[in-house]
C-alpha cells in the first residue's frame, strides 16, 4: 500500500496522527538532507509536539492563489491516490481541514480530471483551505522548477475559486 491510503486509514480508523514527508526509500535515504532528517527525528521523539511549525528551507517559495486565513487539521496526500480512493471507505474526508495534495509524473489534463473527480464526489466540501504541494516532473510541461509548478495554478484556481478559501501553492 502506498503512503496516502495508509495515512488516511490510520487517521480515520485508529485516530492517530501520521507524518507526511519525503518518501523514505526514494527521497530521504537516497539524498539525505540534514534539516529533513532532524525534523523527522524531532517529531517521532516528541521534541516537536502537535501544532509545531517547521520552517521551510530558504529556497522554498509559496504562491498565494487565493488569500485568506484558515485553521484545521492537515489532511491529504498524493492526488492520484486520493482520486483513486473516491467511492471507497478510505476516501478522503477533509471537512473542517486544510487539504493538501501533490503528485509526480502527471500531465495537466490528468491533474484536471482528478481534481474534477474529487470535486464532483464532494471531497472539497467544507474544506477550510488548500495547500498544493510539489508536482515534480509534470508531463508535457518543460522544466521542473517554479515555472513548471506555475502551470498548475490556473487549474487549481478553477477548481477552488468559487469556495472563497485560501489556496497556497
Predicted regions mapped to residue ranges:
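Short beta-strands and strand-loop turn motifs
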Residues: 19-22, 101-102, 131-135
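Short, acidic/small-residue loops that bind anionic groups at enzyme active sites
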Residues: 1-23, 163-166
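Conserved anion/nucleotide-ligand pocket segment
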Residues: 15-81
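Short coil/turn connectors at secondary-structure junctions
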Residues: 14-16, 70, 95-96, 125-128, ...
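Oxyanion-binding "anion nests"
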Residues: 74-112
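Solvent-exposed alpha-helices and their adjacent loops that cap or buttress functional pockets
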Residues: 10-11, 66-67, 74, 91-93, ...
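C-terminal active-site/capping subdomain that shapes the small-molecule cofactor and substrate pocket
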Residues: 113-169
